[in-house]
Amino acid sequence: MLTIGQLARIFEISTKTLRHYDAIGLFVPARTGSDNGYRYYQPEQIEQLSRILALRRLDVPLEAIDRLKRDGALDDPQRLRHFLQRHQHTLREEISARQRLLAELDRTLATLAHWRIRNMHARIVERPAFSVVGMEYFGSAPGDTIGQLWERFIPREHEIAGKHDPEVSYGICAQQPNGEFHYVAGFEVQEGWPVPEGMVRFQVPAQKYAVFTHKGTAPQIAESFQAIYSHLLAERGLEPKAGVDFEYYDQRFRGPLDPNSQVDLYIPIY
């Protein structure tokens, strides 16, 4: 005979599982020691336990397995096959229902994103020229590179002296003639202050801007820029102008992945 420990090892399950099966009458030992309470099983019981565990891996409830056993279907290949076919059909219906639910969730999220973008209001401001000191990136595909630039810059931002407002940082973006862009993560700095090693000073020209407030995560900023240039400006009778646009980060920015973060997007216009 096999001990409960041997049977547990054969099937790589816990003895607690076997004790539970015994307690509910699903799989009982052939003999239980009267003096020590040890459970012993016959080798012939291995096949039945194998079927029980196979059904559990298929997410069949213990109650259903118990009914199969009591009805004799657990040891009847034909009846077990019919049960599994019904279980397969049920799973497919559940998966189909979940897929419909997931599709509805996708539509809801898309609607919320559309609502978030459609409700961006614009205000018109004119700003004089100002200087930004920070770290720069040249490239053609922003992707994760902008985030990586900020990750390198933030640990060094304390090196910048003469900040106009230490609570406000800028993400400056200037398009280059070759199609690439020049991005600077930095702070507005008064003239005359030194530029730390590895950083640059960028002069932002005086300009008229349409200012939209982006609400959402940092990766979603690209979606807001796309909406602004594709239709939001035109819907408001505004015409974009080639120049320097920038992101304005103040205390409303709670972190790059916080959906409640707010960032002002300054778009140069005529």
UniProtKB/Swiss-Prot annotation:
GO MF annotation: an example: nucleotide binding
Consequence the record notes for mutating residue 31 to A: Reduces c-di-GMP binding. Drastically decreases DNA binding ability, but binding is still enhanced in the presence of c-di-GMP. Reduces c-di-GMP binding. Reduces DNA binding ability. Almost abolishes DNA binding ability
Keyword terms: Activator, DNA-binding, Nucleotide-binding, Repressor, Transcription, Transcription regulation
Outcome reported for the amino acid change (mutating residue 35 to A): Slightly reduces c-di-GMP binding. Reduces c-di-GMP binding. Slightly decreases DNA binding ability, but binding is still enhanced in the presence of c-di-GMP. Decreases DNA binding ability. Almost abolishes DNA binding ability
InterPro entries linked to this entry: AraC_E-bd, Cass2, DNA-bd_dom_put_sf, MerR-type_HTH_dom, MerR_fam, Reg_factor_effector_dom_sf
GO biological process: negative regulation of DNA-templated transcription; positive regulation of DNA-templated transcription; regulation of DNA-templated transcription
Matching Pfam families: Cass2 (PF14526), MerR_1 (PF13411)
Gene inactivation effect: Abolishes high-level biofilm-specific drug tolerance, including tolerance of tobramycin, norfloxacin, trimethoprim, tetracycline and kanamycin. Biofilms are more susceptible to treatment with hydrogen peroxide. Intracellular norfloxacin accumulation increases in mutant biofilms. Normal attachment, formation and architecture of biofilms. Growth in suspension, known as planktonic growth, is normal in the absence of antimicrobial agents. Increases resistance against colistin, in either planktonic or biofilm growth conditions. No differences in colony morphology or Psl polysaccharide production.
Region spans: Involved in effector-binding, probably including pyocyanine-binding: 120-270
Coiled coil (residue ranges): none
Subunit and interaction comment: Monomer. Homodimer; dimer formation enhanced in the presence of the second messenger, cyclic di-GMP (c-di-GMP). Homotetramer; dimer of dimers, arranged in a head-to-tail fashion, which may reduce DNA-binding ability. Conformational changes upon binding c-di-GMP or pyocyanine may facilitate DNA binding.
Function: Transcriptional regulator. Responsive to the second messenger cyclic di-GMP (c-di-GMP) and to the virulence factor pyocyanine, which both enhance gene expression and promoter DNA binding of BrlR. Activates expression of operons encoding the multidrug efflux pumps MexAB-OprM and MexEF-OprN and several ABC transport systems, acting by direct binding to their respective promoters. Also acts as a repressor of the two component regulatory system, PhoPQ. Binds to promoter of its own gene.
Note: Biofilm bacteria exhibit a profound tolerance of various antimicrobial agents, rendering biofilm cells 10- to 1,000-fold less susceptible than the same bacteria grown in a planktonic (free-floating) culture. Second messenger cyclic di-GMP (c-di-GMP) has been associated with controlling the transition between a motile and biofilm lifestyle; increased levels contribute to resistance of exponential-phase planktonic cells to tobramycin and norfloxacin.
Full protein name: Transcriptional regulator BrlR
